[in-house]
């Protein structure tokens, strides 16, 4: 089994964008989100990581656009951004997305989060967005508690997998935080998807080496948009690792 590659399409104001360290105002626009997602699909991606940044920041929604993107793709989609209650979770799943990420609500509404982990199982993943050892919420604009305390609670609730993002690395192309990923994998039996900082094929090989520890996938965004490598090259590298 090789690591799963999830090319990222982050959407703000109807456009595919990339941020640097999650900061609002640091966007670089890359055009139509559907075009980006279809390009990754054509290149062989079997998953797309689709994010509503406006919903994550609490400043709007691209829900209709994202639902349309999901409908037009033939591959699996992990949908993220602004899922904080039953209504938004049901709406996200109704798009046809294979999996929905819950971030802020896992920190701000633990009882609800614990319930949906048990109820929805594999269809829900928990986004752990980390700065140092502190979690961040609300589009990475607020502190959300201690990583290890929250991880322990979520494990007890039966979280099926974690998407772990080092915010200081995201969008910087400075390499992933391998130490953080090792630590998280050592403290949970749930699979981990790595996000943030991937910039080279060597980074993908380094992440593939963590597969025995529990890393099952990697989200790549900026590196693909910037042309550091293609989806096809990334898939080949992960298959050969």
Swiss-Prot record:
GO terms for biological process: L-histidine biosynthetic process; L-tryptophan biosynthetic process. GO terms for molecular function: 1-(5-phosphoribosyl)-5-[(5-phosphoribosylamino)methylideneamino]imidazole-4-carboxamide isomerase activity; phosphoribosylanthranilate isomerase activity. GO terms for cellular component: cytoplasm. It is found in: Cytoplasm. Its EC number is 5.3.1.16. Keywords: Amino-acid biosynthesis, Cytoplasm, Histidine biosynthesis, Isomerase. SUPFAM superfamilies: Ribulose-phoshate binding barrel (SSF51366). Its main location: cytoplasm. Pathway: Amino-acid biosynthesis; L-histidine biosynthesis; L-histidine from 5-phospho-alpha-D-ribose 1-diphosphate: step 4/9. It comes from the Bacteria. Belongs to the HisA/HisF family. This is 1-(5-phosphoribosyl)-5-[(5-phosphoribosylamino)methylideneamino] imidazole-4-carboxamide isomerase. The gene is hisA.
């Amino acid at each position: 089994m090789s690591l799963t590659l999830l090319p990222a399409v982050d959407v703000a104001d109807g456009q595919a964008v990339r941020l640097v360290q999650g900061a609002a105002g640091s966007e670089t626009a890359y055009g139509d989100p559907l075009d980006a997602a279809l390009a990754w699909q054509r290149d062989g991606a079997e998953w797309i990581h689709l994010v509503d940044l406006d919903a994550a920041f609490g400043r709007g929604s691209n829900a209709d656009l994202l639902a349309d993107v999901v409908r037009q793709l033939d591959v699996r989609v992990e949908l993220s951004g602004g899922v904080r209650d039953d209504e938004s979770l049901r709406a996200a799943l109704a798009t046809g997305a294979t999996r929905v990420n819950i971030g802020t609500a896992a920190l701000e509404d633990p009882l609800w989060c614990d319930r949906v982990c048990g109820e929805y199982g594999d269809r829900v993943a928990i986004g752990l967005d980390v700065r140092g050892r502190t979690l961040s919420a609300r589009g990475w604009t607020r502190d959300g508690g201690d990583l290890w305390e929250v991880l322990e609670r979520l494990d007890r609730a039966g979280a099926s997998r974690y998407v772990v993002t080092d915010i200081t690395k995201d969008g910087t192309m400075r390499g992933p935080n391998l130490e953080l990923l090792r630590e998280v994998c050592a403290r949970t039996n749930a699979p981990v998807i790595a996000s943030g900082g991937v910039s080279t094929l060597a980074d993908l090989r380094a992440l593939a080496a963590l597969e025995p520890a529990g890393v099952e996938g990697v989200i790549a965004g900026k590196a693909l948009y910037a042309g550091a490598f293609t989806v096809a090259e990334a898939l080949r590298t992960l298959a050969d690792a």
